[in-house]
Amino acid sequence: MKTIEVDEELYRYIASHTQHIGESASDILRRMLKFTAGQPAAVNDTQPVSAPAPSKAAPSAGNESRPQDRVRAVRELMLSDEYAEQKRAVNRFMLILSTLYRLDTAAFAEATTSLQGRTRIYFAGDEHTLLQSGTHTKPKHVPGTPYWVITNTNTGRKRSMVEHIMLSMQFPSELAEKVCGTI
């Protein structure tokens, strides 16, 4: 077993692709790279990729689930102790974003790319991109995802962002309203 050092952003991106508890980094990378044991290593002269931008064609764990299952998962989040223990709106906001991403990565990616302010970008694949649209944006990494989001917006804007994402992901508007009311 060899050890390599990766930056925090890359580590989080790899970790966001964990499919089950206890899965090793090697297993995750093998799956992501479609590399099997015993396969000869191909050496390519490739340019480094700047940011792990989420792809619209990325397979989505939520695509196979029925819409009722997605709705139930969001309702269960709203009733969970973990959600109830969140004292700050920003923490509830981040928990909701993580859950929506986990339910349907492709739909989440599509929804976030269409979500921008007049002068700001709200979501990006790295902190630097968000800081370029404003130095006081307070970017935070959305746990379990390759995304960063600005967090120095008021609660109303956070609600608006969640509502846009949920409606873009085809959640019932009543559920989106209910979720936004808890932020």
Swiss-Prot record:
Q: Which UniProt keywords apply?
A: Cytoplasm, DNA replication inhibitor, DNA-binding
Q: Name one GO biological process term.
A: negative regulation of DNA-templated DNA replication initiation
Superkingdom of the source species: Bacteria
GO molecular function annotation? sequence-specific DNA binding
One term under GO cellular component: cytoplasm
Give a yes or no for keyword Cell membrane in this entry. no
Name the segments for region: Interaction with DNA.
Answer: 89-90, 118-122, 152-158
The record's Pfam families line, in alphabetical order, gives: SeqA, SeqA_N
Record region (Disordered): 43-70
The residue ranges flagged as biased composition, category Low complexity, are 50-61
Q: Cellular location of this protein?
A: Cytoplasm
Cleavable signal peptide: none
Q: What do we know about how this protein assembles, alone or with others? A: Homodimer. Polymerizes to form helical filaments.
Job of this protein: Negative regulator of replication initiation, which contributes to regulation of DNA replication and ensures that replication initiation occurs exactly once per chromosome per cell cycle. Binds to pairs of hemimethylated GATC sequences in the oriC region, thus preventing assembly of replication proteins and re-initiation at newly replicated origins. Repression is relieved when the region becomes fully methylated.
Q: What family is this protein classified in?
A: Belongs to the SeqA family.
Could you identify this protein by its name? Negative modulator of initiation of replication
Q: Which organism is it from?
A: Pantoea ananatis (strain AJ13355)
